[in-house]
Amino acid sequence: MVHTVQAECCGKTITIETGKIAKQASGAVMIKSGDTMVLVTAVAMKSAKEGQGFFPLTVNYQEKAYAGGRIPGSFFKREGRPSDNETLTCRLIDRPIRPLFPENFLNDTQIMATVVSADKDNDPGILSMIGASAALMVSDVPFAGPIAGVKVGRVDGQFIANPTAEQEEKSDLEIVIAASQDAILMVEGSACEVSEDDLLEAIFFGHKAVQPVLAAQLELAKKVGTSKREIPAPVVNEALKARVSALAKEGMKQAVRIKTKVERHLAIDAIADETVAALSAEFEGSEKEIKGFIEDLEYDLVREHIIKDGQRIDGRDTKTIRAISTEVSLLPRAHGSALFTRGETQSIVAATLGTSVDEQRIDSLYGDSRKKFMLHYNFPPYSVGETSFRLAPGRREIGHGMLAERALQQVLPKHDDFPYTIRIVSDITESNGSSSMATVCGGSLSMMDAGIPIKAPVAGIAMGLIKEGDDFAILSDILGDEDHLGDMDFKVAGTAEGVTALQMDIKIGGVTREIMSAALAQAKAGRIHILGEMAKTIGASRGDLSAFAPRITTIWVKVDKIRDVIGSGGKNIRSVTEATGVSIDIDDTGKINIASTNKEACDLAIKMIRNLTAEAEEGKLYMGTVKKIMEFGAFVEIFPGTDGLVHVSELDTERVKNVSDILKEGDKVLVKCIGIDKQGKIKLSRKEALGLTFTE
């Protein structure tokens, strides 16, 4: 049976339908707003695999090319590996729903969101977030939903829910929020140095906006009436748990206070091994359970120590930032480079400048576009003392890179003022928490080292949360273990003036306004401290580019002269690049960017282009080349492709019988422009140029 519900979200109608398509899935909905439609399915296997120790949730998001009336541009003409945008949308769907499954539900579960129709004004990613929740709500899969997503923008001081493409262009912030009826579950976005108070208002504006969508999902679930699966409660061996606690608790109290990560992990592993050995005879085959109870002990002890004593794993209080060291110009041949170290987290970051040919081509639902700023984040296994087989970057690397890219993009100069393609690469060389924020700091330093005139330095910090009942502690600059054992990972990046990017994920049922406000305020204090540490090394962009970076000079020509620059079949522009070795980019407005690491080559290219587009001026002297001898005079080329006639009467002060007595083809001759007729024909005189000196 087909069931349909509708919700109004700030003037836009969202329709959710189930029971018509993909009926063999555990749950399936078609969600629509405007002309954008997404099919979202949820399937969970009937039982968990034997020995399954984690929740295997997979989220897939795919944009079908036909949804935008396009044929894929790849060689095979079909959809292939996910684009970065599809990968990022998968993460947006996954992160708010993952904490809402029961802890003991370990069945293979897959969410698939397929964009089947798309307009430019209704974001399919937002609809996919809502659709994933709705598909789970109408299924028999246990899920503590609903949740809903919304994108918030601000134009002329007014907040807008799910802005159109035109409104997004004018907006000074873009934040995606996922929320339940009572709390915020996830936040991600960027802003143009917006204050913490304004961000908080935007987030809770979004929370209010999604309430009708949440109500519609509850209505749909009620209409469908599917009963949820019964999940057996986990059986806990209380006797074993008590024995593990008795044997290991005192040792664990000391181990969790060891300040260095490797030594701490070795100590905890040693306690686990000793406990397994001590209990192996009494509780045969219980090694996995024993190690699970050791992990529970670590979880409880770390959190208790923070809540009761205000002291963290490495001895810091809740607000202290780890020691920071910075270095720039680390790599002599890179255009800009930095080494950023914060505690046991370290990143080498390099900035490279390129031209328009280096722009990334993006093939999307809405057509081709070009990307002029890229940040790539790499997390090699050695950074955490591990080994693995590395192929393409994973979802986490793409997500962390995009967060850092958004943070830095807000301070870039306008492309007209700095017409370079910029690529930042961050290689994490050590990691113990907050490597994406180390990338932001290192990226800012490397751009300043490269001489990119950024608006202001940017720093980032990761905040954590430990919440027990009504008590909570907010942690600045979290360690990896604090991320793992805590309830929130809240990354905030920005300048001294305001926030440029943020991302919040939680592992509990939601966070309140009070917690978010306190976290943002504490993050600001931490960010200002980090900016101060960075400024000790470099506080503003260098005044010049690296000697190894291309110099781009911009000149303009009249639009009707573009064809003269290019020439037939590209002949003219090719002759310039071959003669000078420069890279030239021409757009249809007459703007020409000339790039070269050699100033002399660039100057020569400019001169050659000026010659190609130059127009004769009456009364001006020109050094020309005789192209053709006629009985009535000689044709002299004064610019490439532009010549004029020197009539026989204008060859000399005395009467000339034969033109060839004075000039021959190929001769260089100084002439003066004495007129241009209505047809644009140029009249030249050698006679009037005699005795004059030519200067370019």
Swiss-Prot record:
PROSITE patterns: KH_TYPE_1, S1. HAMAP family: PNPase. It comes from the Bacteria. Residues 619-687 form the S1 motif domain. GO terms for cellular component: cytosol. Residues 550-609 form the KH domain. Its cofactor is Mg(2+). Keywords: Cytoplasm, Magnesium, Metal-binding, Nucleotidyltransferase, RNA-binding, Transferase. Involved in mRNA degradation. Catalyzes the phosphorolysis of single-stranded polyribonucleotides processively in the 3'- to 5'-direction. Pfam families: KH_1, PNPase, RNase_PH, RNase_PH_C, S1. The gene is pnp. One of its GO terms (biological process) is mRNA catabolic process. This is Polyribonucleotide nucleotidyltransferase. It comes from Citrifermentans bemidjiense (strain ATCC BAA-1014 / DSM 16622 / JCM 12645 / Bem) (Geobacter bemidjiensis). Mg(2+) binds at residues 483, 489. It is found in: Cytoplasm. Its EC number is 2.7.7.8.
